[in-house]
Every structure is written in C-alpha cells, then in structure tokens.
Amino acid sequence: MALTAGIVGLPNVGKSTLFNAITKAGAEAANYPFATIDPNVGRVEVPDVRLDKLTELIKPQKKVATTFEFTDIAGIVKGASKGEGLGNKFLANIREVDAIVHVVRAFDDENVMREQGRESSFVDPMADIETINLELILADLESINKRYARVEKVARTQKDKDSVAEFHVLQKIKPVLENGLSARTIEFDEEEQKIVKRLFLLTTKPVLYVANVSEDEVADPDNIEYVQQIRKFAATENAEVVVISARAEEEISELDDEDKTEFLEAMGLNESGVDKLTRAAYHLLGLGTYFTAGEKEVRAWTFKRGIKAPQAAGIIHSDFEKGFIRAVTMSYDDLVKYGSEKAVKEAGRLREEGKEYIVQDGDIMEFRFNV
C-alpha cells in the first residue's frame, strides 16, 4: 500500500529540490518556472528503526521496507484554474493524489526567481498559500457547478435516492467554496463522506505544509517570522507544519549513513527533514505499519489505521483475505522485550486474533488462511 502525496507550490519554492532529496531521482531543478512539466513520481522507502531492530533480532536473508509515493507537480501560478501557466494539467495531477504537501518559501534569496509580477527578493508566505488555495477552491467550484444543475434536475424530477443525497452534499459544499473556504472545513457524516470521495475534490484532501527555510536557519526555526506565519495559518486548518531546508536535504541525500550523521550533527539536527516529513505524511493519512517476520524475510507493510485483520492480510495477497482463518500476532515491543517469538509465547503474550481484530501499529503478524 503506497502513500501518494503530491508536492505542490508556486514556481521556485523548492519543490523539485525537495523531491530530489526524497527520491534521489535527480529531477531537473532549474531556476526558472515550469522546469517540471510532467509530474515526477518517486516511490521511496519509509525509514523505520523497528524494521532495523527486527532484522537485528531475527537475522533474515532479506529486509524489505514499506514504501510510499511522492509526486512532484509543476508550479501552479495565479489563474491556474482558468488554464494560466500550465493550469488544468497540474490540477488534474493533484486530483489523483491522496494528500497534498504544500511547499512554501520561507527564506530570502535574491538569486531565486519568482512568478511573474513578483520581485525575487519579496517573500510573502501567506500570499503564496492564498494563491495556491484559491486556485484549488476555484477548480473545485467549477467541478461542483458542472454537477449541480444536472444532479438537481434528477433529484427534483425523478426523486432518485442517490441523486437526492448527492444534491444535499453539493448544497453544503457550494456556498463554502463561494466564500473562499476549502471543502475540508465542512463536517460530513459517514454517508456524506462516501459521496464526497466520489467527487474527487481538491480541497477535501488533507494538507501538510512544508516551510522551506535556509540551511543557516533550519536548526532553530521557531524565531523565523515566515515560519511563525505559516504555523499560525496551518493551525486554522488543523494542519501540521514541517520545517526543512530543501537545499540541505538534497545534499544529505547524496551522503552515506556515516557522513549523513556527521552532517546532521554539524547542522545541529538529530534527524533529517525527509524523516520528519515521512512521519508527518503517515500521520496525515492515518497510516500505520505492521510486520511479517521470518528467517527468509522481514518486511514492513503499510495499512490504514482502523482496518481489521483480514483486510490487513489482503494487503499481502487477496487470497490471504479471502481464506483468512486467524492471525498469530505479537507486538513489536513484546518481541524486543523478550527477544524471540518462543519467549513471547512462553510469557503468554503471543495471541491468535480473529476476523474482528483491529490491527495495531507495530503488530508482527503471521496469517493463517485456506483457499
């Protein structure tokens, strides 16, 4: 199960530089707008110290990390919803991702170009955020307006149950968008959420803000005025802010583990910005990790929190879900505490879970099935 997050922002805020650091893909990061036209998609491993510890304990032939995907979507400019810049192509790319990572420039650099009509040295995080959000809102409003009249007609004339339910949802969304607010600010019940999901709206997607600061300021970002502004706005959306230096992260991505540790220590950091971003993205999408562990392989698997054991088994293979019998389960903490599966069992901590078991982050599972 791959997390899919689209990296968005105005031209030259550091999107492609960040993407390069995440994926080590070397995507073009030229200093001019629209250096990225087709989205770059990178699948990256999720760093997890638990996977490393399990490998140390079990000593398998192979270790496999779970993965997630980032898409570097070319810079959006004011008027994108009307086709400005490379407009609707970018919005269509954003529509396909599960979450939005919104990169905001929070550093001064006279050598970095800005979008047309903005001086290179002028930094205004709030204006940048507003520009992006407004384009997404306008794109959603266009989508809603296209559906509104047609669904209303069917709902009123044919009394179709599904159309009536959808029209009710459209009536909730339309005025909110018209007032310049994102659809994610609306509370929907469970049935309404199913309808909203089918609308593929941009402003219902969860958002994570990335404040891209200079290398000199990344170790102590709390006093940066730009970062304070971004955090204040993000709080109004219950969104998280991750502070990174994309340029520093790109340098770090080229180093081996030993040099990486020394580089981070020299900068006054205890972890990379990419690791922080990964954790934040996981939290944003409500994801967790369970493990399968044996002599041949130790592997991490991504799951949506709240799923039951059969659905977790289905992540490995559909046959596991269809023929699910039970899941022999222990927690990561118990395995580390007792040192082996045998010791966990002797301590009475090895469990057999059935079809109603809600999988927990850090579970180590062996699925029993019959097809």
Name every feature range the model reports, one short phrase each:
Residues 64-67, 90-94, 101, 125-136, ...:
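Short, surface-exposed linear patches
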Residues 3-8, 13, 19, 150-358, ...:
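C-terminal-of-GTPase-core extension/linker across diverse P-loop GTPases
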Residues 1-115, 126, 151:
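Conserved G1/Walker A P-loop phosphate-binding module
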Residues 42-47, 74-84, 95-163, 176-189, ...:
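Conserved Switch II/interswitch segment of TRAFAC-class P-loop GTPases
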Residues 16, 33, 69, 73, ...:
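Generic signal for short, ordered secondary-structure residues
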Residues 34, 48-51, 61-70, 84-98, ...:
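Amphipathic alpha-helical transducer elements in NTP-driven molecular machines
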